Amino acid sequence: MNLDGVFVESDDEKAALASAHGNRSLEAKGSYNTLDFVVRLRPDLHKVLEAQGGEISMRECDFWDVAQAFSTYLHETIHWWQHVGTSAGLMLSFLQPAHAHMNRKWLDDVLATHGPVKPLLRLSEKLSDAEQPDGALNLVLNNWHDLDFFQKLVINPVGLVKRVAEHPYFESVGHSYRMAIGAASWLIGATVDPNYEALPHPRDWEADMEALRESKAEGFYFGSPIEIPPLGLLEILEGQARFSQIQYLYGASGGYLSWDDFRKRGMLDGVYVCAFETFLDFAEEGWPATVDDPIVGLFLLICDVALSPSEGLFLPMTDPSSLIWSTDPGWRFIFLCRLAKEEGRGFKRSIQTYSAEEYWEVSQRLSDLLLSPSPRQFAEAVSRYAETHPAWIQLMEEDRTFEYREGNFPIRVLLGRFTRVQRDKLTAPQFFCWPGMCLTSYRQALDSETVRSLFSEHQALFLDRADRDVYPRLVPGKDEKTLQRLLDDFYIWVSMYEMTRQWLVEDGPFDYDYGWLTSKFSGAEIKDWADNAFKVGTGVHPDAFSVLR
């Protein structure tokens, strides 16, 4: 079972295994999956929240079960923000679509040469055994593996580096990271900036990458030693979500709950605390006395900055030799922790009021020391593109109405949401960095009206309900038919991406397990739906495929 890209909220690490894509027996309290873009809650938590009449008092909860249920929803909503509101998460969200979009021409060539056969990985092995290599097929599979290596090294470097390093398709860390940035850039460019009039072009630093390979710079050539950070994106994302959740519960209790209370509830174990403990180690700090201690605020800010690499994607790549360290969230996190330590104890205690001013000041200082564009520079650049570039202006109008053009549909949806986060972050960065402190009145990090407006705007687009089916989130002022059409159109594309993945690398016939999406249609109806989407995308019906053994 592949759990890459599954992010869960659980008091039991074993329960997380039940929340993988396609498994309807959800035991964890909640989950968010990079492949299906759905925020899920356990049915009993849905019932608790639904009993509030759809209106959750985020600032004052009279009952612990309501506060706890909402905190789980907040935890999973933060995973949505991480994936559509940060550059690291956006790249992760774009990996599966990239296989279908960027390989389109070469997949057509493979179909023309070999006909409809699956999986292409098995076809490549047979051609290799017969010493009949196919250039287009090799490009498709090289692209697949490069992006897969990036995902593995970024999410779980410690657990997966050996598997990646020993894979026959693996060239180098730098190459995989370059391909991932290029794939995301290509999707964004094709959607809003096809001539790269605003965005930096990946080819601008192509020659530098070749020079690094030829000079055998570490990390950029075949056979190079691989240095990995002690943690990956998984630990950072779960740590950020869990400690924000804990701060919310702390504030909702009026500051009554202690660390021991959260430990007794199983909220400070395993993957959920790994990033925080790593931060304390590298920053040379002891465990803070209270949940709202400045050290906790600094940890969450470092998570935020670590998830915001921008060079090569939205801003020019200034030093290609630092590509790995400037892109990888795990390395960024470690370097930021070290820099915070070097700045001294006074700096580490800068977050006193959890204000926008503190966020900008501390994030700018750390970014300057990291020699990296700051979150403000990043957000300003994206906002500038969205305000001055005609195609991006059009996209933001689509995002406002939730009525999107057909081409690159999921890319338009995700990029529109990403841009909206960056715009709103310029006015209220503390909401996205310290949501737990903003969602209660305990520390009053942000006024109530602004908090409600921002939380309403940035909840996930797609949620499950107690029956486990997926529904569009109801948005005030938006027609329900428009929102349902958004969901329908979005998941037509998602099904095509999944079928393309199976075509490339999955043994056996096509699998039509879409029970994670809906239980309201028969297996035959679901198959027809997925088959039609795939045929529109590829020109070939799945039933025409021969399965290689």
Where are these regions (language model features)?
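Active-site cradle of extracellular carbohydrate-active enzymes
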Residues: 187-194, 198, 229, 233, ...
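Short, compositionally biased low-complexity segments
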Residues: 41-50, 208-217, 244-252
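Long, low-complexity, polar/charged, intrinsically disordered or flexibly structured peripheral segments
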Residues: 149-223
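Cytosolic/matrix-facing juxtamembrane and C-terminal tails of multi-pass cellular membrane proteins
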Residues: 217-219, 229, 252, 256, ...
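Post-HExxH zinc-binding segment in Zn-dependent metallohydrolases
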Residues: 84-157, 235-253
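Short linear interaction motifs
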Residues: 51-63, 209-227
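Active-site metal-coordination segments of metallo-dependent hydrolases
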Residues: 227-240, 262-273
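Non-catalytic terminal regions of proteins
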Residues: 1-98, 181-200, 257-549
